[in-house]
Amino acid sequence: MITATALAILPLAAACGEEQAGQQPGSGTVRVEPPVTGTKWNIATVTADGTTHRTKGDAQIAIDPKTGKLGGRLGCNHVNATATVGDGHITLGAPATTRMMCEASLMDTERALLKLFDGKITYRIDQNTLTLTSANGTSVRASAAK
């Protein structure tokens, strides 16, 4: 009888404390963050020179894991650059952009976003939000496209 009781209690005891990282307590599901590469990221805000701005236009980026290239739009112009992804950081090459002129707010967004390029930046993904931060203090928050 004691053996049967112990066997009945054992699975219950083992289940205690089995929440996994990224899992909401009691939800029964594990949140899986999108990877930094192969995901289209819609840029929501950019912080440069101590000021945060919501992006204007269609600002988005994606890193192709096969080619090691970043491509996207900076609000007005298209951008391409090499992108080497490491543990918690990305090394971006010098950007190549198209040269269209757009309204001033779009060009301001673009100038701020270009401050991320040509160097090593850190990245973090939390709740489908990508945060990029450069050594010069420029940071970007972007959400995974659906």
Positions of the model-derived regions?
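Lipid interaction determinants
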Residues: M1-K146
